[in-house]
Amino acid sequence: MFNTSEEVRIVTETIRQAARERIAPAAASVDATGELDGEVLSLLWDLGLMTLVFPPEFGGAEQSQGTLLCTAVEEIARHCASSSLMLIIQAVGSFPLLHGGSRELLERVLPRIVERRELAAYLVSEPGAGSDVGSIRTTAVRDGNEYVISGTKCFSTNGPVASYYTVLARTSENGRNGLSFFLVDGDAPGLKVGKIEKKLGQRGSKTSEMYLDEVRVPAGNLLGEENKGFLLAMKDFDMSRPAIGAQALGIAEGAFDQMLKHSRERKTFGQPLCEHQMIQQIIADSATKIEAARGLIYRAAALYDQGKRNTKLASMGKLFASDAAMQITTDAIQVFGGYGYMQDYPVERMFRDAKLTQIFEGANQIQRLVIAREILKEAA
């Protein structure tokens, strides 16, 4: 841990205990039913975790917001990735509002969000625009004191349950320099929930298509400057990618804990599994990857908290941790053997949950391009 402030230590221990005692018991049910446990969601709000990145006067942390977000996500993902995803999406979906909304807008909507415990959704991806954000076709046309937004968004986490949406739409035909963010209320006429997706993993969060059919929003709901939405999205990544890395880290740790326990208890050829050299190699490699991932993630989070550029480390942390999580969960199933393939044991769920961390907020192939670009900038 790179930030060892008393606040971080206290929060870490509080979350760790809550995750172990109150979130872990519901994890299998959350996965099986595709429904997040209501008591777990209430717990996340009660602990102040859903507003960690908000201004302090609206329930946010006084300092170290990036580190605390990563800490909370990691500890919860160790037991239930779906529950940890709620923290990530709340932070990601709120970022354009928090960093682009006018003071008047923030003072009007943030108290409502906190009081009513409203969920956010982040509407960026489209059927023809995933990693290529500049290809977004959803439009926002100025009409007097309003903007009229029309288009289709996909893979919208929290789409069916959110109360407010931050929507990236095209305000000019200037590629990525023609995009703008808007705040859209969940009850806005013309905003409709489309197909609810059936997912491989992290099933406790609802993901859907979203349709915007001439949705009218006040001009004051523009977040940041017009045509500067792409830059706001890139800044959002500097916060979200370490958090996703932390989720991958938590999943990897959870699988490692299960693997280690099983390898000590299960006997084969007259001795515990952990006494076999091939199993020891898996244990050693997994533990090393976990420690290396933690270093990258919390360095990136510390830079974010200091207001310093962390783009390279944020991508490195997400890339390394998510690849490590995929490998460690795969190896955990291998150590469990046939039992690991069965839903009676949590490692198969962790394996499915890990895959998303290699994809969302920029696929790992994109992370490699970002890392190389940043290195070449530094070398120029």
From Swiss-Prot:
Enzyme type, top EC level: oxidoreductase
Keyword presence, Flavoprotein: yes
Keyword hit for Flavoprotein: yes
A UniProt-annotated Pfam family: Acyl-CoA_dh_M
Membrane-crossing segments per the record: none
Cofactor: FAD
GO molecular function, one term: acyl-CoA dehydrogenase activity
Keywords noted in UniProt: FAD, Flavoprotein, Oxidoreductase
Enzyme nomenclature, EC number: 1.3.8.11
Domain of life assignment: Bacteria
Catalysed reaction, written as an equation: cyclohexane-1-carbonyl-CoA + oxidized [electron-transfer flavoprotein] + H(+) = cyclohex-1-ene-1-carbonyl-CoA + reduced [electron-transfer flavoprotein]
Cystine bridges: none
Protein family (similarity comment): Belongs to the acyl-CoA dehydrogenase family.
Free-text function comment from the UniProt entry: Acyl-CoA dehydrogenase involved in the anaerobic degradation of cyclohexane carboxylic acid (CHC). Catalyzes the 1,2-dehydrogenation of cyclohexane-1-carbonyl-CoA (CHCoA) to cyclohex-1-ene-1-carbonyl-CoA (CHeneCoA). An alternative substrate, cyclohex-3-ene-1-carboxyl-CoA can be converted to the corresponding cyclohexadiene-1-carboxyl-CoA isomers (30% rate compared to CHC).
NCBIfam families linked: CyhCrbnylCoADH
Subunit-level organization: Homotetramer.
Entry protein name: Cyclohexane-1-carbonyl-CoA dehydrogenase
